[in-house]
């Protein structure tokens, strides 16, 4: 299912997956899935919002996949406004637990979610970014506020390189701590061909 969402800059297709047993009086988590370069919101939806929908066996969340802006680089400055207006629409029309709003994405979608983590800490509880980078077409001013953040990088990714992912991590560690003191509290990375570390 999808809607044609009218916002201040036009119309954007937005895919919404509601729990089958949706109760208008029960607050639900809200999870945004952001498409990658060359991708589509329909692909995010078909792939279960990076697998998160498939593990939501108790139907605790509403999942949303907005289409990008239609260009090769699907998220830009205007899309931060799209996010704000779409979030306001969803909170006004569905029973959302506003303390549990999340965003995730892969590659360019991760870069957009990462950008949101810099200045939307007041509305986002956490982001999960797969193959992210600390850069984008446009990035917001950073707010020195904490947010939950998990990043996964690929050691052989030539576009969103491991170094870009590590830079994104270091920025969040700086924002998440007074005076940036957490910058050196990095999680240990797994060695190549070794088990993941959590």
Tell me the role of every PLM-derived stretch.
Residues 95-107:
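Alpha/beta-hydrolase fold nucleophile elbow
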Residues 143-149:
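Short, proline-enriched alpha-helix->beta-strand connector loops that line the catalytic pocket
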Residues 19, 49-57, 117, 140:
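Mature extracellular/periplasmic domains of secretome proteins
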Residues 30, 34-93, 193-197:
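Active-site machinery of serine-nucleophile hydrolases
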Residues 151-153:
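Short beta-strand/loop motif that positions the catalytic acidic residue
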Residues 156-161:
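Acidic catalytic loop of the alpha/beta-hydrolase fold
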Residues 1-30, 104-128, 132-134, 167-170, ...:
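A domain-start/cap signature at the N-terminus of enzymes
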């Amino acid at each position: 299912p999808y809607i044609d969402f009218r916002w201040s800059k036009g119309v954007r297709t937005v895919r919404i997956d509601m729990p089958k047993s949706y109760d208008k009086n029960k607050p639900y988590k809200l999870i945004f899935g952001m498409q990658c370069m060359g991708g589509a919101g329909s692909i995010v939806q078909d792939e279960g919002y990076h697998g998160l929908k498939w593990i939501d066996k108790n139907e605790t969340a509403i999942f949303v996949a907005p289409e990008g802006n239609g260009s090769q680089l699907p998220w830009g400055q205007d899309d931060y406004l799209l996010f704000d207006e779409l979030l306001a629409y969803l909170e006004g029309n569905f029973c959302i637990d506003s303390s549990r709003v999340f965003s995730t994405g892969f590659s360019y979608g991760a870069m957009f979610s990462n950008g949101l983590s810099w200045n939307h800490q007041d509305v986002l509880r956490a982001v999960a970014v797969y193959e992210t980078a600390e850069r984008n077409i446009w990035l917001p001013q950073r707010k020195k506020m904490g947010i939950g953040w998990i990043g996964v990088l690929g050691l052989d990714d030539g576009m969103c390189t491991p170094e870009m992912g590590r830079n994104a991590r270091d920025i969040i560690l700086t924002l998440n701590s007074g005076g940036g003191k957490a910058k050196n509290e990095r999680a240990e990375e797994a060695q190549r061909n070794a088990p993941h570390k959590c």
